[in-house]
Amino acid sequence: MKVIIVKIWNKINGITLINDDFLNVDLPNESIDLIVTSPPYNVGIDYNQHDDTIPYEEYLDWTKQWLKKALTLLKKDGRLCLNIPLDKNKGGIKPVYADIVKIALDVGFKYQTTIIWNEQNISRRTAWGSFMSASAPYVIAPVETIVVLYKESWKKLSKGESDITKEEFIEWTNGLWTFPGESKKELDIQHHFR
């Protein structure tokens, strides 16, 4: 019998939430229904365990590795919800969203939709320099994307009873979600108390 060791963050009603480095998690193939993740954006954030300043091509190679693993772990009707930025300006402008979606399709994922997450956070309004001499402005989008991908079948193969209301269904199937993201300070506080 194989022993699986992972950092289980929480168990609720038969659902296991795992908080660990995805490439180090040892789980059986086709055993996961849903993966929700926000991978490092490669913009220099200190994650303690991940170098978030690698060259962009290395970042895309690393992305391809974990997307391949995600595909093998998902059930045939499994889904991947991927929170990623539209682009990044640090170290040169890069189309992160477009590059990662292309890699996901190349490794075998099927595309379902993209949800726009309006974080309502425009804290860097002067990032493009002086408005008095705006010769090369940056467009700052206070949004991120949640890309919804699936393995083989978008329709869930096993039927079950819905546990959401009609209103929740309508709200959650709208492609624009508006709620504030957590600040780095809030995340640091949460990490400190775990």
Swiss-Prot record:
InterPro entries: DNA_methylase_N4/N6, MeTrfase_CN4_CS, RM_Methyltransferase, SAM-dependent_MTases_sf. Keywords: DNA-binding, Methyltransferase, Restriction system, S-adenosyl-L-methionine, Transferase. It is an enzyme of class 2 (transferase). Belongs to the N(4)/N(6)-methyltransferase family. N(4) subfamily. It catalyses: a 2'-deoxycytidine in DNA + S-adenosyl-L-methionine = an N(4)-methyl-2'-deoxycytidine in DNA + S-adenosyl-L-homocysteine + H(+). Its EC number is 2.1.1.113. This is Type II methyltransferase M.MjaVI. It holds the Pfam family N6_N4_Mtase. GO terms for molecular function: DNA binding; N-methyltransferase activity; site-specific DNA-methyltransferase (cytosine-N4-specific) activity. GO terms for biological process: DNA restriction-modification system; methylation.
